[in-house]
């Protein structure tokens, strides 16, 4: 009986974790470059089937509890929107923009850049956007509207090339660890390579999820939690009957 009780309780715990991920995804729907978080629940229906088929609700000798796979990020391409803003750029294809973090390079899909008071190309958080030779500096007197960014990441101020965006790709994105809503750090075993992604000026890649997708997930999570709650109640009732409390 106890394994069945444990199974239903852990199933509820897993659905709570999935709910947290969906809530985070919904909170970041408007965040450029945000990558959707996913927690998969392993074999939920398989785990509950013995409870549903049991005549007394406690035939659970083979149940060990629902399990959740580790949270992971979905790095699929998000929708690209036109902004007509010169320093908004999006990547079409695999890869990341490289920016300077406090402890080394960080990687992002968000290309919402601007110039700081010193004329340095920076992110919304004020981190320097890295080029092939370091930060990208726009000459004095050049405005944002005069900056051109080519498809290969070359950055021009008028007719003068002032840098080229450092674009990075990883063979396995699972080596990346989130350090912010749209920033990632690479592990020591990560091997960065060049990418052939196309840079699109005047556009932004948005979060790679939608309110419809996440609301559908919420409905599914709610149904799974209700099923686990019913199983838990059935087991608890049977236990109480068998020990003479009812």
Regions found by a protein language model. Name each.
Residues 1-246:
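Amphipathic alpha-helical polymerization modules
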């Amino acid at each position: 009986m106890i394994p069945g009780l444990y199974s239903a309780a852990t199933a509820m715990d897993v659905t709570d974790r999935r709910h947290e991920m969906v809530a985070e995804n919904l909170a970041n729907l408007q965040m450029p470059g945000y990558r959707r978080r996913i927690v998969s629940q392993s074999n939920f229906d398989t785990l509950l089937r013995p409870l549903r088929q049991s005549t007394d609700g406690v035939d659970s000798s083979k149940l060990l509890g629902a399990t959740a796979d580790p949270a992971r990020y979905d790095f699929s391409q998000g929708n690209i929107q036109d902004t007509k803003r010169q320093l908004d750029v999006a990547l079409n294809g695999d890869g990341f923009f490289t920016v300077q973090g406090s402890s080394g390079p960080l990687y992002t899909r968000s290309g919402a850049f601007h110039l700081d008071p010193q004329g340095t190309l920076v992110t919304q958080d004020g981190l320097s956007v890295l080029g092939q030779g370091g930060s990208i500096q726009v000459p004095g007197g050049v405005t944002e509207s005069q900056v051109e960014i080519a498809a290969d990441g070359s950055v021009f101020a008028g007719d003068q090339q002032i840098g080229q965006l450092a674009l990075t790709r990883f063979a396995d994105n699972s080596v990346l660890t989130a350090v912010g809503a749209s920033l990632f750090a690479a592990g020591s075993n990560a091997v960065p390579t060049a990418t052939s992604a196309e840079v699109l000026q005047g556009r932004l890649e948005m979060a790679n999820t939608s309110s419809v997708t996440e609301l559908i997930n919420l409905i599914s999570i709610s149904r799974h939690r209700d099923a686990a709650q019913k199983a838990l109640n059935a087991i608890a009732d049977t236990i109480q009957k068998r020990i003479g409390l009812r």
